[in-house]
């Protein structure tokens, strides 16, 4: 059966494996968007290395977990945010993070997938994808 939201499945897989104290997580199916989100999480220090495996179907990703994820998940529906929206962090974003200094909101911008802090730094808005803390 095809997956309705592969990004939501990937984030749920990461969270479930983290709560089970596993050292690795196997994400399937793989996509460019999931790989971009994993790069942002890796850059922020939430996950370790990850490897894409082409199995001739949709692909798989093996992620090394560091034990730093307390909660992660998708933001659905994907809210559009302009630069001013990122500055004042609207109420529907505030409900996903425990504090303004803890965690990141992952956004998709015309310059690629990045955290909300990078979006503020580059003065660019985008569409919310998920959250991690």
Swiss-Prot record:
This is Small ribosomal subunit protein uS8. The gene is rps8. InterPro entries: Ribosomal_uS8, Ribosomal_uS8_CS, Ribosomal_uS8_sf. Keywords: Ribonucleoprotein, Ribosomal protein, RNA-binding, rRNA-binding. GO terms for cellular component: ribonucleoprotein complex; ribosome. One of the primary rRNA binding proteins, it binds directly to 16S rRNA central domain where it helps coordinate assembly of the platform of the 30S subunit. The keyword RNA-binding applies. It comes from Sulfolobus acidocaldarius (strain ATCC 33909 / DSM 639 / JCM 8929 / NBRC 15157 / NCIMB 11770). Belongs to the universal ribosomal protein uS8 family. Pfam families: Ribosomal_S8. Part of the 30S ribosomal subunit. HAMAP family: Ribosomal_uS8_A (MF_01302_A). GO terms for biological process: translation. GO terms for molecular function: rRNA binding; structural constituent of ribosome.
